[in-house]
Design a protein with these regions (language model features):
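Short, flexible N-terminal segments of the mature chain
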Residues: 18-44
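Acidic, low-complexity intrinsically disordered segments
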Residues: 36-86
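Short, charged/polar N-terminal "headpieces" of proteins
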Residues: 1-19
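A structural detector for beta-sheet-dominated domains
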Residues: 12, 24-26, 80
């Protein structure tokens, strides 16, 4: 089972609401996690959102289910959407 690192992320959207999501990565690298968060936010039209280590912080490591491992092998990361995400 692939081990992944979970970064808990809270970002303010353009309309002012808070988006909560996790960034899953295969490498425990805080800067990479922030870059991945920015990439995903840009892809949904929220590229101006502030993402720093304050908004995106390491939470824990865990085993990855197959669909997550597949996405990480393909893209380097997986976004797990929680509150306020489109």
């Amino acid at each position: 089972v692939m081990e992944i690192h979970v970064y808990d992320t809270y970002v303010k959207a353009k309309d002012g609401h808070t988006m909560h999501f996790d960034v899953f990565t295969a490498v425990k690298d805080d800067q990479k996690a922030i870059e991945y968060a920015k990439q995903w936010l840009t892809s949904i039209g929220e590229g101006d959102a502030a993402v720093t280590s304050k908004e995106c912080s390491f939470c824990h490591s865990q085993g990855a289910p197959d669909n997550v491992a597949d996405a990480i092998n393909k893209d380097g990361y997986f976004i797990y959407k929680m509150e306020g995400c489109k």
